[in-house]
Amino acid sequence: MTIETLSTQSKAQVLAEALRWLKQLHGRVVVIKYGGNAMTDDTLRQAFAADMAFLRNCGIHPVVVHGGGPQITAMLGKLGIEGDFKGGFRVTTPEVLDVARMVLFGQVGRELVNLINAHGPYAVGVTGEDAQLFTAVRRSVNVDGVATDIGLVGDVDHVNAAALMDLIAAHRIPVISTLAPDAEGVVHNINADTAAAAVAEALGAEKLLMLTDVEGLYTSWPDRDSLVREIDTAALEQLLPRLEAGMIPKVEGCLRAVTGGVPSAHVIDGRVEHCVLVELFTNAGTGTKVVSA
């Protein structure tokens, strides 16, 4: 079934159901981490861009934080550079960082900005290096109980919220590539999941949405019957050690955002067309909702 096959009455019911959520979110910031298949499938990319324009025209303030893992990996392969992951994070040498900067801002960010701007002059591409938007602090990861160095990888230590709010006040949609200098000016690669959480916390966002390539959070992956629709931060912290490595940054991001005051974080299936609108404006939603304990 598509929207074209719905009866006029059914379409009206869909719009009426959205009213409650439109009222709740009007004038509020929603931070969306854009990644996974939604970045590589043309239909999903265009649907995501349309969703951002829809939010903007409903008086909601979307802020997009994007990754670029598949594109970085592809470019590293073309250049003959070996890549590695530890604890769900990309090991970033100076050589890998150069590629990440080129791909994140020069390719992925530009493509998304152009797709959104096909609907109007809304999107502005920035990195954490612009206007001192982010300040990074270097991080390690825990691998089998051992703190492990992963190179030029950081967490967001500070967000220049005023700079982002200036863009929002100008009715723009910030599209953020996750690169940021530390206090000494050394640029780091920032995981987009953890960066999105820092942005949501700093802006006092109403919601944080994480796009993934699965239906949501599973308590016992790959058992699909273990999908949870809602979980609180206490239960999620207990679940964290058992999660698949690639899900760890997303869960860490959800925990940071919700414990930092964001009312809810949502891990949603980015393979679903218009997944952002489904999650925000329908009673059923899609994926897993994380709330405070």
Swiss-Prot record:
Pathway: Amino-acid biosynthesis; L-arginine biosynthesis; N(2)-acetyl-L-ornithine from L-glutamate: step 2/4. One of its GO terms (biological process) is arginine biosynthetic process via ornithine. The keyword Glycosyltransferase does not apply. It is found in: Cytoplasm. The keyword Cytoplasm applies. One of its GO terms (cellular component) is cytoplasm. It catalyses: N-acetyl-L-glutamate + ATP = N-acetyl-L-glutamyl 5-phosphate + ADP. Keywords: Amino-acid biosynthesis, Arginine biosynthesis, ATP-binding, Cytoplasm, Kinase, Nucleotide-binding, Transferase. Pfam families: AA_kinase (PF00696). The record marks K33, K250 as: Transition state stabilizer. Catalyzes the ATP-dependent phosphorylation of N-acetyl-L-glutamate. Belongs to the acetylglutamate kinase family. ArgB subfamily. This is Acetylglutamate kinase. It comes from Mycobacterium ulcerans (strain Agy99). The gene is argB.
